[in-house]
């Protein structure tokens, strides 16, 4: 049985650990904090429980798959409740726009704001579907870990106009500034700037239309907790407060983890869910990284950070949707 290690207990690390285990590997997951979740951390204060990271689920099938790998059903442990609307926009001119699953209702709202944009939206959706089919369904499963791989798929990226920004893409089809804002907001979900992020991210619009947007009852922390239980049921070892200090390489392969507590372990398979630039520059070292990673590190730009305020309220605001954006 191969020995596998996963660095990082975010959703990516959890998924990697479960998939490795389903293929027969003996898996150990190392998390530097005292809880799993990564950006999906949970904190409690004054009797309130806050999800510090994501609060919606846009590709539920990915989580269903993880339970199905072991003959289990997600619905036996979790409830994904569909949201309607998905987002509510309150604009500076006092107009409101609900973006949600009801196509006819949404088209009616677009017509009230800008009649000329109804046809434009349908054309935009058609093009977004094309980007989704090519960018998500055909390319998302391919690893872009080598420079030649990126070059190979460059024509497809050009075909999708990946050199344009999401806002430029949306503006080709919609005229009204409020609608342009509403339909170019998706990059913010991944820390991107709509005016700079590649138009490939317009596929998120199609992804939302295809699978919907859901809230996990009990919060995202509930989802993390049930995935943690699933890992434990399957014999995955979870090591908390294990901070990786550096990685040893042998024959151009990473073979050993070294931790800040002085311990080290060798593995047959190592998967990292940590920040790629941190891994290549700090954990591996600049002198040992590949030409591809050196190229990426030189030109990569970090996404924006956020300043987030969390409020606790004893009152329910029925006119405030789950995601309300001013």
Tell where the protein language model's regions lie, with residue ranges.
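Rossmann-like flavin
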Residues: 92-197
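N-terminal glycine-rich phosphate/pyrophosphate-binding loop and immediately adjacent elements
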Residues: 2-130
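Generic, well-ordered alpha-helical scaffold segments in large soluble proteins
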Residues: 19, 23, 169-173, 182-185, ...
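Helical element adjacent to the flavin cofactor pocket in flavoenzyme catalytic cores
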Residues: 203-254
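Mid-domain catalytic core of redox enzymes
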Residues: 245-326
């Amino acid at each position: 049985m191969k020995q596998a290690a996963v660095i990082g207990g975010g959703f990516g690390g959890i998924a990697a650990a479960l998939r490795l285990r389903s293929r027969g590997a003996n898996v150990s997951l190392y998390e530097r904090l005292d809880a799993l979740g990564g950006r999906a951390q949970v904190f409690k204060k004054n009797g309130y429980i806050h999800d510090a990271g994501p609060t919606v689920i846009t590709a539920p099938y990915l989580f269903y798959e993880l339970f199905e790998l072991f003959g289990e059903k997600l619905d036996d442990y979790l409830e994904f409740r569909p949201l309607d609307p998905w987002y509510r926009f309150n604009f500076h001119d006092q107009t409101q726009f609900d973006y949600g699953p009801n196509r006819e209702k949404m088209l009616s709202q677009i017509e009230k704001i800008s009649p000329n944009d109804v046809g434009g939206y349908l054309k935009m959706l058609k093009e977004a579907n094309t980007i989704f089919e090519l960018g998500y369904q055909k390319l998302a499963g391919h690893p872009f870990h080598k420079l030649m791989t990126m070059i190979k798929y460059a024509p497809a990226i050009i075909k999708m106009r990946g050199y344009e920004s999401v806002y430029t893409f949306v503006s080709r089809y919609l005229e009204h500034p409020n609608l342009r804002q509403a339909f170019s907001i998706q990059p913010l979900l991944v820390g991107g700037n709509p005016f700079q992020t590649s138009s490939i991210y317009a596929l998120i619009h199609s992804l939302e239309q295809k699978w919907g947007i859901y809230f996990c009852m009990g919060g995202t922390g509930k989802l993390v907790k049930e995935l943690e239980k699933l890992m434990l049921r399957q014999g995955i070892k979870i090591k908390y407060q294990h901070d990786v200090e550096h990685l040893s390489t042998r024959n151009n392969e990473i073979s050993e983890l070294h931790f800040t507590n002085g311990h080290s372990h060798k593995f047959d398979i190592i998967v990292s869910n940590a920040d790629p630039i941190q891994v290549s520059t700090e954990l591996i070292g600049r002198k040992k990284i590949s030409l591809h990673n050196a190229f990426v590190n030189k030109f990569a730009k970090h996404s924006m950070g956020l300043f987030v305020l969390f409020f606790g309220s004893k009152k329910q605001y029925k006119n405030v949707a789950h995601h309300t954006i001013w």
